[in-house]
């Protein structure tokens, strides 16, 4: 991994993730901004991610899945959580970016011509939602594309300690090698 500076951020990369470190974006009611740095839980530090969104990033309960996103408080059914964000790429830009790998593990289709790629950690915490395939559980969140953004909504109540799980769709599950 190599480091470089980018707009006041520290950046390190590996083959599928670009790790970006920035200052937490939380601003208190008195106008003071949190001084903590964040690399994983953008735009907030881990403390403010728990406080604002009611979730935290930690090792997934699904073998081989890497990191997952977990509730730290009760989240009712039919609640908007946050957007799935990242680089907005045309299909040709996406194809060029993943020519060697064949697919983007953090990519989601916004529309037939635009793909959101959350390969950078500053794309936000939605990138840590794992697929329910292989978990023995059912999805508890879903992706909803408005055509301008992809929103994450709960589809059943989520209790503290529950991992947020979504249906990635057949094409992605096959690309990940989870089904044939």
Q: How should each PLM-predicted stretch be described?
A:
Residues 2-21, 26-29, 133-180:
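C-terminal SET catalytic tail plus cysteine-rich post-SET Zn-binding segment of SAM-dependent SET-domain
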Residues 33, 44, 74, 80, ...:
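Acidic, Ser/Thr-rich intrinsically disordered and amphipathic helical segments
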Residues 21-51:
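Cys/His-rich Zn2+-coordinating "finger/knuckle" modules used by eukaryotic regulatory proteins
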Residues 52-136, 179-180:
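Catalytic cores of histone-lysine modification enzymes
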Residues 18, 28, 39, 69, ...:
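Intrinsic disorder
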Residues 33-36, 46-47, 84, 93-94, ...:
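Intrinsically disordered, low-complexity regions enriched in proline, serine, glycine
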